[in-house]
Amino acid sequence: MRQSIHLLLFLAIPGFVPACQRDMAAHRRAWEAARPSSYVFEYQRTCFCPASGAWWRITVKRDSVTDAQLIDSTGVTRGLRYIHSLAQPTLSELFTEIAANLEPATAWARVDYDPQWHFPINASGDVVDRTDSKWTLIVRHFRSM
């Protein structure tokens, strides 16, 4: 209980989330400046949501998804019936998704970025006063085309 109170107090410190958002904004600007016109990457989203845990290979051309292939669904336990109807993001859209997850005042996130391209490679977060709100995003095998 004591640790929970300290965590909530830490999250209530003004500037905690804005610092994360400023860092993310700097990486997003660097990504947008360096972003190739076409690229491929694999990613996985985990959350308390349908199709959580699936690995996708995403092809992007001119900042639009042109192909999304499900490459591994062995860890998926819910949402298999409509997994292929889910929209998949570009790397630019992952920044927007992470920022949206930081909107609640009690939200936190940790984001690691690719050192060359500056897109998120590993992000996780939670909203501490909501049940089942923990999420992760993992990006791997990025390749410029």
Question: Where in the sequence are the language-model features?
Answer:
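Positively charged n-region of N-terminal signal peptides that target proteins for export
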Residues: 1-5
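Bacterial N-terminal signal peptides
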Residues: 7-15
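Bacterial signal peptide processing site
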Residues: 21-23
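A short, structured loop/turn motif at beta-sheet edges
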Residues: 32, 59-66, 114-117
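A short, Trp-centered hydrophobic/proline-enriched beta-strand micro-motif
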Residues: 34-45
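Mature, soluble, non-transmembrane domains
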Residues: 44, 75, 80-145
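Short, surface-exposed binding/anchoring microloops in extracellular/periplasmic proteins
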Residues: 45-62, 67-70
